[in-house]
Amino acid sequence: MQVNIFYIQKSDEFKTWSEKYSKLISKYGTLKEINVFNKKIALAQNLNAIEAKKSYEEAFMPYKKGYCIALDERGKDLTSIEFAKLIQDKNELSFFIGGAYGLREEFNQSLDFRLSLSKLTLAHQFVKTLLLEQIYRAFCINNNHPYHK
């Protein structure tokens, strides 16, 4: 399975944890983590939320392939087992984590699924790490590995 995570961030304070789960995931499939942060996004974020969200969408559009999932606090809450079922038997998964202003509603609606990891607003760096852990957990569930007890 091909797993793609597209995100927007300047730095990664959770890099050690992200690397740990990336390595574990590689036992089950191919993982690509792509940071699309660029100068246009940096400038747009200094203007306003509307321009920032537009710049995020422009950066993400070329990567919409496979089964596409937006990470969104207004998305659907799933248990780890439900998440494992959702991603099971997919050839390619693409996850989109918005920047500081989130994602435009129109972009979210254009994807296959909207996933909420929490009703709380979370730092996007933390969301990526949490998502990696849940992807690994889902692979373990789907492969009867004892990580998920």
UniProtKB/Swiss-Prot annotation:
Q: Which SUPFAM superfamilies match?
A: alpha/beta knot (SSF75217)
Any Pfam family: SPOUT_MTase
Any GO MF annotation of the entry: rRNA (pseudouridine-N3-)-methyltransferase activity
Name the Enzyme Commission number(s) assigned to this protein: 2.1.1.177
Q: Is the keyword Methyltransferase assigned to this protein?
A: yes
**Listed InterPro entries:** Alpha/beta_knot_MTases, RlmH-like, tRNA_m1G_MTases_N
Q: What is this protein called?
A: Ribosomal RNA large subunit methyltransferase H
Organism of derivation: Campylobacter jejuni subsp. doylei (strain ATCC BAA-1458 / RM4099 / 269.97)
Highest lineage ranks of the organism? Bacteria, Pseudomonadati, Campylobacterota, Epsilonproteobacteria, Campylobacterales
The UniProt gene name for this protein comes to: rlmH
